[in-house]
Amino acid sequence: MTSVDCTAYGPELRALAARLPRTPRADLYAFLDAAHTAAASLPGALATALDTFNAEGSEDGHLLLRGLPVEADADLPTTPSSTPAPEDRSLLTMEAMLGLVGRRLGLHTGYRELRSGTVYHDVYPSPGAHHLSSETSETLLEFHTEMAYHRLQPNYVMLACSRADHERTAATLVASVRKALPLLDERTRARLLDRRMPCCVDVAFRGGVDDPGAIAQVKPLYGDADDPFLGYDRELLAPEDPADKEAVAALSKALDEVTEAVYLEPGDLLIVDNFRTTHARTPFSPRWDGKDRWLHRVYIRTDRNGQLSGGERAGDVVAFTPRG
């Protein structure tokens, strides 16, 4: 696991967070502009780790920042039970960390059809949530590359923890294509590389249709044959050709074999390289007592893979266009 202990940087990070507007949702563009300015002053070792990860990625496909400043549990609001967050909600420390770290990496992005087009998402258990939703708790959220079916798929998924689940059993699972690729034979690699396969989309992107079918085309592996990007979704990728099904099954098995579990604690921030990994979450049991697991999520776009065409700003909200 690639991780950075940020405990020693607490005073500096709190000082940087104090420079940010107190109600980020009131003017998110201004908040993220301020975060970009402040991110230039991140502690040297942390800044270097982020810049290196952004430029090169890692074998693990993720970077875990531990020991970031966070409120004491008693000082946090109750875990949310609805979304989106109120516009006047005061800035939480882990939201500030997502602003600083995210602006060091790229541009925070909202997706119009998802979470009312908001950029900052609260992730919490919700009774009766759809099995494909991050709000599930008591069922496995299966492996998926976030929005692999979206032309403007984010480069990074960032998850910051303000409150862990009571039993500390919820694990974020991450599997890296850089680790899985050596487990695939040459024939399987060749079959998967740059081959478009039918893919369904998440509920939010179905336009109110219960089951529109596989409206996107996703390449399971693409780019450099020796260091490819990954497009994988265990629930939504729907190959039809028997040889394609066999190759995807081999990829799925390889990803299972290289899976790492990350147990997020308060003050942890996980950066997932969404072009080289797939991630999941194990079940946990909420108590519905106002103190259940509470993460904050943002999506970051960079200039890789045609995500940016010029003129974009951190805080932009983009519309859905399926990959084809």
Curated annotation (Swiss-Prot):
Q: Which metal ions or organic cofactors does this protein require, according to UniProt?
A: Fe(2+)
* Residue sites binding Fe cation per the record: H144, E146, H279
Query: Per the record's keyword annotation, is Hydrolase included, yes or no?
Result: no
Which residue spans traverse the membrane?
none
What reaction is this protein's catalytic activity?
Answer: deoxyamidinoproclavaminate + 2-oxoglutarate + O2 = amidinoproclavaminate + succinate + CO2; proclavaminate + 2-oxoglutarate + O2 = dihydroclavaminate + succinate + CO2 + H2O; dihydroclavaminate + 2-oxoglutarate + O2 = clavaminate + succinate + CO2 + H2O
A GO MF term: clavaminate synthase activity
Q: Any idea which UniProt keywords this protein has?
A: Antibiotic biosynthesis, Iron, Metal-binding, Oxidoreductase
EC no. given is: 1.14.11.21
What remark does the entry make about the cofactor? Answer: Binds 1 Fe(2+) ion per subunit.
The pathway where this protein functions is: Antibiotic biosynthesis; clavulanate biosynthesis; clavulanate from D-glyceraldehyde 3-phosphate and L-arginine: step 3/8; Antibiotic biosynthesis; clavulanate biosynthesis; clavulanate from D-glyceraldehyde 3-phosphate and L-arginine: step 5/8; Antibiotic biosynthesis; clavulanate biosynthesis; clavulanate from D-glyceraldehyde 3-phosphate and L-arginine: step 6/8
Q: Which Pfam families does UniProt cross-reference here?
A: TauD
Residues annotated as binding 2-oxoglutarate are R293
Q: Give a GO biological-process term.
A: clavulanic acid biosynthetic process
- Tell me where on the tree of life, at the top rank, the source sits: Bacteria
Q: Which InterPro entries match?
A: AlphaKG_dependent_hydroxylases (IPR050411), Clavaminate_syn-like (IPR014503), Clavaminate_Synthase (IPR053503), TauD-like_sf (IPR042098), TauD/TfdA-like (IPR003819)
Q: Which family does it belong to?
A: Belongs to the clavaminate synthase family.
Q: Which NCBIfam families match?
A: ClavSyn_CS1 (NF043003)
Name of protein: Clavaminate synthase 1
Annotated gene: cs1
